Amino acid sequence: MLVSYNWVKEFFQDFPLTAEELGEAITRTGIEIEGVEELSASLKNVVVGEVLSCERHPDAEKLNKCLVQTDETEPVQIICGAPNVAAGQKVIVAKVGARLPGGLKIKRAKLRGEVSEGMICSLAELGFESKVVPKAYAEGIYVLPAHVETGVSAITLLGLDDAILDMAITPNRADALSMNGVAHEVGAIIHQKPAQPTEPDVSEKGKADDFISVEVENPAETPYYAIKMVENIEIKESPLWLQTKLMKAGIRPHNNVVDVTNYINLLYGQPLHSFDYDKIGSKKIVVRSAKEQEEITTLDGEKRTLQAGHTVITNGVEPIAIAGVMGGEFSEVTENTTTVALEGAIFSSSSIGKASRELYLRTEASIRYDKGSDAWKVEKALAHGGALIAELSGGTLVGGVVEVDNREKAVNKIETSLTRINRILGTAITLAEIETIFDRLGFVLEVKNDALIIEVPTRRWDITIEADILEEVARIYGYDEIPVTLPATSTTGGLSDSQKARRVMRAYLEGAGLNQALTYSLTSKKDATRLALSDEKTVALSMPMSEEHSHLRTSIVPQLIRSASYNIARKNMDVALYEMGTVFYATEGDNLPIEQEHLAGLITGNWHTIDWQKTPKPVDFFVLKGIVEGLVNKLGIKSELHWKQTEKEELHPGRTASLILEGQEIGYLGALHPAVEANYDLKETYVFEINVAALLDATKEKVVYHPIPRYPEMTRDLALLVDKNTDHATISQVIQEHGGKLLVDIELFDIFEGESIGENKKSLAYTLTFLDSERTLVEEDVQKATNKVIEALQEKLHAIIR
């Protein structure tokens, strides 16, 4: 948020800090200031001038020869190329010797033979970004109001004798997304109470009920909705003070109605929206959920398709605004507007955030609703906005508001103690200091024996538990004032067995070709239950930052799927990821959730083997199966890993297996269901997820080291035809049992099914590797072992050797 230093000072009678000092003080209390920009640092000798005459340059069609009065001396001639310059205008003039942003220094010059003694400036030439310059002046100079005195400093007039603090507001401090909120924060720092904003004293006439009525269909999504009416208005430019406040905050001025809604949003952090009353087409506003595929053209001219669940403002028939996000073009305020219906509302932060993300439409209003707002300041903001519109437009403020109020006000009281504060913070704060701290914060403190009971104002809705109170004490007391203490004991370094095992797993998976991923533990309600190993209940956050991060995950795989989709959308087509992280399951009552460590992986695209001579091949079930089996072997687990075909929602019904270790199901491995792959624009994709605790707790074999073989190995390829229902594990077991001590490795390299070999048959091809560590093998040794394997396969599995 861009904060004007001069605007902050307006809240206080005596302000003791410079802009730089204020930035440092705010940063020390927990809100980072990313930068402080002095707007006038590169400006000098810029004044208000009056264009006395304006005529075309004799030798340049696009240039104008202007006679400009800048002070009490003789007027000067200035050559200007702006298309909107005209006689009688009050303009911004950089005199000879002036300095402008970018190091530009104004000198007396000749342009096409005519002398130019200065420069008539646009706002962009004074340092304003083009996106905040009013559209009427986007292609030319800025024209000042006619009443402005000639010769005065344009730097002061435009509020450029100011500094802008760029505040990085964290999600929990949305109260600071307003000047009023910033003023409270600054007041706590400088030991002063900020003045509260006051609306203009405007008389009211008539009743708002005579103009419109309001109906809210879902009070949970819209706890409060109100309309304030202003009639007989004249749409025109806002006064200079309002335009400059908006531009310095990064907002483009439009007109005296829209600018007031943006100003109130900045001042209170409460979004308002203005409807052209005559365009609504009804005397009734209905707030409801959008219908699936319902459409609205928003103020930016885009036609948007809504989803069920988006909250919309309607005239009883069709949407006129997307609640909390953006108004509709249908009811836009224009230069012909004479009556305004001004909306002030409280919407569900989760629903507004969800709509904003799904529509890819992020606005100043949606940002504030998404992060949360003070539900009890909306009436004051609406009253201020209505009165200011009436004052600036010469309109009539209609009496009363039309409202639907379903808010429930609860006093937020939190209890702690002085002893607990000092013990946790490591301080020796006195009760008197605590009382001063809470007074500076504007919190009400009640002392009962040893207990401190703090009543938190509604503007600080982020404070809900004792830890929040302790943080506030630490912030205002000063983090740099908290004594540094050393640990009471020392510990010896070293890794536990489980830490060593985790390092082995990571090293093995990375060596196998997978890249480590780190994804959020927070996910949406929908994703929280997908592809979980357990059917336990999910854990919901009490104060989620957004709907997309409202639950703790029960599986890592959904986040890996999103990561793969993100990579493929950016043309990284071959993705191999793994993550070792925590999943969470709910427990009964208010007990802490169960935390389990899981290992998950994903491969999609082509698989690149280590051998440079082999070409990449599409991923398949057996690539990932081999990696998982290799991981189990690497950990030295004594028991064999068994595979059992299974079915799991969102996985392919014919390519999914559960992993069985020591008689316990510890995970799953399978291909994503084609519908899931299509939803994320993925090609064939395989995933696995394993309970890490089961791997760590499994019985391990003793590590035995063998010398590197001195003698060469020999291989034999074996292709066999077996019944379609015979699985690879059974075949591998028979080969292992009858291959003898010389057989050191079995690799399946081909599977074939088709009409040419029979309907209920399949062909599997294996490479058998033989090795003797004591001598060089001869053909007779290998053939003898191979024959035993063939005989066993024929006898036990009725295999046909091809």
UniProtKB/Swiss-Prot annotation:
This is Phenylalanine--tRNA ligase beta subunit. PANTHER family: PHENYLALANINE--TRNA LIGASE BETA SUBUNIT, PHENYLALANYL-TRNA SYNTHETASE BETA CHAIN AND LEUCINE-RICH REPEAT-CONTAINING PROTEIN 47. Belongs to the phenylalanyl-tRNA synthetase beta subunit family. Type 1 subfamily. Binds 2 magnesium ions per tetramer. Pfam families: B3_4, B5, FDX-ACB, tRNA_bind, tRNA_synthFbeta. InterPro entries: aa-tRNA-synth_II/BPL/LPL, B3/B4_tRNA-bd, DNA-bd_dom_put_sf, Fdx_antiC-bd, Fdx_antiC-bd_sf, NA-bd_OB-fold, Phe-tRNA-ligase_IIc_bsu, Phe-tRNA-ligase_IIc_bsu_bact. It is found in: Cytoplasm. Residues 40-155 form the tRNA-binding domain. Residues 409-484 form the B5 domain. Its cofactor is Mg(2+). Residues 709-802 form the FDX-ACB domain.
